[in-house]
Design a protein with these regions (language model features):
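Positively charged
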Residues: 1-114
């Protein structure tokens, strides 16, 4: 199974805002993201990490899912966290995260869900 190449930092696409996308495009990108994520062994992957400028990401913690046009709308309790990133290989980075976040994203029927 051929997978997409992971974009490595400091490639500009990693810091360029992504664009909203339609469901059909999001689903196609999500398939590529899951294939690449499974091959590389991460917990999550965004479209810009495989060279796509679309607002799509996948998460594979307990039950795999993808988000189309996600937007963080609420954050709770900032923490400092050390984590890895597939776009910054072989390094652990200390970064700000939150214990909880609330996300809005487009649903399969093109409505919003939380």
């Amino acid at each position: 199974m051929e997978t997409k190449q992971i974009v490595i930092y400091p490639n500009d696409i990693l810091s360029t805002p992504t664009k909203k996308t339609d469901l059909e495009t999001a689903q196609k990108i999500a398939v590529e993201l899951f294939k690449t994520l499974n091959q590389e062994g991460g917990l999550g992957l965004s479209a810009n990490q495989i060279g796509e400028d679309k607002s799509v990401c996948v998460v594979n913690v307990t039950n795999p899912f993808f988000l189309q046009n996600p937007k963080i709308v609420k954050k709770e309790k900032e923490i400092i966290y050390k984590e890895g990133c597939l776009s910054i290989p072989d390094k652990m980075i200390t970064t700000k995260r939150y214990e909880k976040i609330w996300v809005e994203a487009d649903n399969i029927d093109d409505t919003m869900f939380f």
